[in-house]
Amino acid sequence: DTTPCGESCVWIPCVSSIVGCSCQNKVCYQN
């Protein structure tokens, strides 16, 4: 299951990657 992190990654990387979020389909998701 993937949970949206409420962040977009169209122009910049996911800042929320520090809490385990990654970019999928231009939106940051937590795996």
Curated annotation (Swiss-Prot):
Domains (record comment): The presence of a 'disulfide through disulfide knot' structurally defines this protein as a knottin.
The organism's place on the tree of life at top rank: Eukaryota
Disulfide bond residue pairs: C5-C21, C9-C23, C14-C28
Tissue specificity note: Expressed in seed but not in root nodules.
Species of provenance: Clitoria ternatea (Butterfly pea)
Record note on modification: Contains 3 disulfide bonds. This is a cyclic peptide.
Ranges in a coiled coil: none
GO biological processes: defense response
Sites of the Cyclopeptide (Asp-Asn) crosslink: D1-N31
Record family assignment: Belongs to the cyclotide family. Bracelet subfamily.
Keyword Disulfide bond: yes
Name of the molecule in the record: Cliotide T13
Keyword set, alphabetical order: Disulfide bond, Knottin, Plant defense
Function summary: Probably participates in a plant defense mechanism. Not active against Gram-negative bacterium E.coli ATCC 700926 or Gram-positive bacterium S.aureus ATCC 12600 up to a concentration of 100 uM under low-salt conditions.
